[in-house]
Amino acid sequence: MQVELRDPKTIMKLSRLGSFHQSKLSFLRSFLKEFKDWEYNRNLFDLDENGYGRAVYSFSKKNRTYSLVCFANRISDNERSDRVIATKWDAAFVLHDGIPTKKDIERLELNVPKQEVGRLSYKELTLSRANKSVRAFEHVVDSLSNGRQPDKEFLSKVGYLYRTTAVYGSGKFGLADRFRIKNREEICGPFRLEMMLVYLVRQFTFDQVNHIANHKNPKNFIELDKEISRNLGIGNSTGLGMAPFIVNHPTLLNNWILAREKALKKVREVKNVQKEDFDIFVQCLKKSIKNITSWNTDSEFQKNKIKQLIADLNKLLVYIDSFNFQDDFSFNKLYLWVEENLDLECSEYIVSMMLEPYDSIINPLVHEMSSEEEKFFNIPGDRTVLDLRNILEEKYADILRIDFSKKESNENFWFISKNKEEPRLANRYNEQGSDLEQPLAIARDIKKLYERISNQKNSLRIGRFLIENNDLRHVVRRAFISEKFPYSEIQDNTIGSNLMPIDMLRLKLSFFGAVKFDPKSDKWLRICMFQGAPLPNELKKFSDYWVYNSLN
């Protein structure tokens, strides 16, 4: 039996994309698998009794070393903010190419804590900063210094000791441009360096909390239990800065979604599902429900989604009790039942679960998730208006039905903030600045393009058309990209009144491998990464299902 790939017109709706969850394809999981044979070292740990100072951690293999350089700083409580306008943080980090010299560390110490205001060099690859979860951090310090382990239930509600508020790469603020490193085999997968930075930052948080507790009361101090450490991740506060990425990188977005869709298709095509594979699926599913129950949020929107997800998963477990996995194509049968009987959130959740047993399917696809975007930048000027019209009618049918003469269809606009050069979303009718609008209203511009070519001759060459219509060059390019890359385009209006920007954030974060989505509004949220992951000195031997570990 051959299963068709799912229709992009269905999958690329934001309501569905915003229901994606971490999976075996997620970058932090594939990063750990790829780097399990690298040698981990803590090269420098020079903190004072209060935990302020410098530290260096590294991964090395053969002649290659990547080093995380950490700077822990003293700040007051009123200076601690997750907002992008913040200028001070509890700690600042940079991933350095090679082992930093004393001179490098001194140079970095002057610049890294300044973040965007500082200046870095081609030797630096990624940049980040993070703030303590003060309640969790102080609870752990107090517990360890008094000879007891911290409260697991309390920590499970937070999930981390620090949360990052930004991770920068690829040429930002002087960091190395991508062309310098893109041919390195070990980092050819998406966001490998960013994942490495966050993972090593996590280890720094454990070392720092142990160090402070030890100095506070050396007689009674005990070290943080390894099991508790494993089940703490790194938090992240993420806002609109992440959203335009998936619009601005259509071929990359396609490759992420296509890998997932290919994986699902191949799993559904497995004729004889082995008992051990079905058991892995069920075990991961049951463990994951335990994790969902520890997913805390103050957002009523997210509480309702979690409540519905748990209800749907319990329905599924009842169905599975009488399900015969020995039937031919049993995962396909299961998937079709889920699509018909459960909500979107649960459907996409189960897609992630169904991938778990199949390394042989997933591992090759991991290497298809990058993109050489410049190869597809040129517009085929010798193609015709007829070609373009056919593409628009086939690939953008739902978008062409949107009525942009209605006020609500144009309600929002995207712009770049002056002070932090970060993307923002504003109401076109209540706020100023629409003259600075960024070209992120793809649906509106596709519709405009379709109307513009309606009175053109079918035989007109695209190159000739663009001479008079240069303002639409960006969507002409996208249309021809969509011809080759079916999952490259969001099939929704990104400036309409019903836009939920958080769906765009969740999509990207699910591919990172984030869990515990905690929306603080429809424009920013907190998440957790690497919760349950092995510690760096345990990488050589660990279960690939670590993500389903739980503090509870």
Residue ranges and their predicted role:
Residues 16-42:
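Amphipathic alpha-helical segments
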Residues 498-552:
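Long, highly charged alpha-helical interaction/scaffolding segments
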Residues 63-127, 198-214, 218-246, 255-258, ...:
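Intrinsically disordered, low-complexity regulatory segments enriched in Ser/Thr/Pro
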Residues 2-19, 50-52, 65, 220, ...:
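Long, solvent-exposed non-transmembrane regions
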Residues 32-89, 386-387, 391, 400-402, ...:
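Amphipathic, interaction-prone secondary-structure segments
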Residues 111-180:
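Charged, structured surface patches that assemble and position nucleic-acid processing machinery
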Residues 340-347, 381, 401, 417, ...:
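Long C-terminal interaction/binding lobes of large macromolecular proteins
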Residues 29-32, 138-141, 145, 159-162, ...:
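Residue-level detector of alpha-helical secondary structure
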